[in-house]
C-alpha cells in the first residue's frame, strides 16, 4: 500500500525526483481520505438517539381464531377459573319493579304496541295564548311530559318496524306531530319571556327605568278598580248563566 501511494504521487507531479519524496514511514499519512471510511463515531457527544427495541403497536399480534393461538402475554383472567353458565330453568327469577323508570317508555297498560284507536285518541296541541298564563314550573313539567310521550311513541314505532306489524304508522305520526307542536309553542313562550327580560335589563342599565317608577305603577295598579258590568236581563225571564257582579 505505501509503494502504490508513492507511485501515484510520482505520476501526479510529473516524475518528481526521489530526493524530494517524503520518507517511507510517512507513506500512510499521504493516503487519500476518500479511499477509507470511518466505521466508528468520531465525536464523543451526539444528539442522535441510540437505536432501541421497537415496540409492537398491535396488541393482537399472533392471535388467530383459525389456528387457535392465544395472546402472547398471559392475562389476568387466566389466573381464575371461568364461571360456568347456568341453565335457564335453574336461574332464579328476579322480581320486577313496577315503578322502574324504563316503564315510562310504554303506555299505562305497558303494551309494546298500542292499537291504532289508542294512538288516535288524543287532543290538540297547546296554544301559545294558553301557555303564556303558565308559570315556569308548569312549562318545565309540560315540556318533559312531551319528551316522555315522544319516547313512548318512538318505542312503539321501533317495535312495529321490528315485528313488521303493518299498522299504526299514520296514527303514531299524527300523535307525534301534535306533541311536537306543543313543544314548539313552549319554546316560543320562553323566547318571548327572554326578550322581555332582556329589554327590561337594557332599560334599567340605560337609566330610563328605575325602581321608583315601578313603585308608582304598582300603587296605581292597586288603586284601579274596574267598573261593574251592566247586563240588562230580559223582562219576565231570569238568566242564570249571566250574573251581575256586585257594585263596589
From Swiss-Prot:
GO biological process: mitochondrial translation
Renumbered residue ranges of the record's region Disordered: 77-107, 223-248
Keywords: Mitochondrion, Ribonucleoprotein, Ribosomal protein, Transit peptide
GO cellular component annotations of the record: mitochondrial large ribosomal subunit
Entry keyword Transport: no
Domain of life: Eukaryota
Chief localization: mitochondrion
Keyword Ribonucleoprotein applies: yes
Gene3D superfamilies: 6.10.330.20
InterPro entries: MRP-L47_sf, Ribosomal_uL29_mit
MF terms in GO: structural constituent of ribosome
Compartments, as annotated in UniProt: Mitochondrion
The family this protein is said to belong to: Belongs to the universal ribosomal protein uL29 family.
Classification via PANTHER family: LARGE RIBOSOMAL SUBUNIT PROTEIN UL29M (PTHR21183:SF18), RIBOSOMAL PROTEIN L47, MITOCHONDRIAL-RELATED (PTHR21183)
Subunit structure: Component of the mitochondrial large ribosomal subunit. Mature mitochondrial ribosomes consist of a small (37S) and a large (54S) subunit. The 37S subunit contains at least 33 different proteins and 1 molecule of RNA (15S). The 54S subunit contains at least 45 different proteins and 1 molecule of RNA (21S).
UniProt-recorded name of the protein: Large ribosomal subunit protein uL29m
Record organism: Ajellomyces capsulatus (strain NAm1 / WU24)
Amino acid at each position: 500500500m505505501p509503494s502504490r501511494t508513492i507511485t501515484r504521487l510520482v505520476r501526479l507531479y510529473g516524475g518528481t525526483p526521489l530526493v524530494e519524496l517524503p520518507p517511507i514511514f510517512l507513506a500512510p499519512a499521504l493516503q487519500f481520505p476518500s479511499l477509507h471510511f470511518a466505521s466508528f463515531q468520531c465525536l464523543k457527544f451526539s444528539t442522535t438517539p441510540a437505536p432501541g427495541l421497537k415496540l409492537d403497536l398491535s396488541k393482537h399480534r399472533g392471535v388467530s381464531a383459525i389456528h387457535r393461538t392465544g395472546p402472547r402475554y398471559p392475562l389476568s383472567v387466566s389466573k381464575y377459573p371461568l364461571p360456568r353458565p347456568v341453565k335457564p330453568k335453574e336461574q332464579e327469577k328476579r322480581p320486577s319493579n313496577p315503578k322502574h323508570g324504563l316503564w315510562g317508555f310504554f303506555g299505562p297498560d305497558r303494551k309494546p304496541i298500542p292499537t291504532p284507536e289508542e294512538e288516535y285518541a288524543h287532543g290538540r296541541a297547546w296554544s301559545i295564548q294558553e301557555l303564556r298564563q303558565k308559570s315556569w314550573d308548569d312549562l318545565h313539567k309540560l315540556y318533559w311530559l312531551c319528551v316522555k310521550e315522544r319516547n313512548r311513541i318512538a318505542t312503539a314505532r321501533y317495535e312495529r318496524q321490528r315485528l313488521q306489524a303493518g299498522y299504526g304508522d299514520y296514527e303514531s305520526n299524527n300523535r307525534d306531530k301534535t306533541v311536537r307542536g306543543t313543544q314548539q309553542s313552549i319554546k316560543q313562550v320562553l323566547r318571548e319571556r327572554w326578550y322581555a327580560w332582556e329589554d327590561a335589563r337594557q332599560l334599567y342599565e340605560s337609566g330610563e327605568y328605575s325602581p321608583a317608577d315601578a313603585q308608582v305603577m304598582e300603587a296605581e295598579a292597586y288603586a284601579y278598580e274596574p267598573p261593574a258590568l251592566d247586563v240588562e236581563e230580559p223582562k219576565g225571564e231570569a238568566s242564570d248563566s249571566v250574573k251581575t257582579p256586585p257594585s263596589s
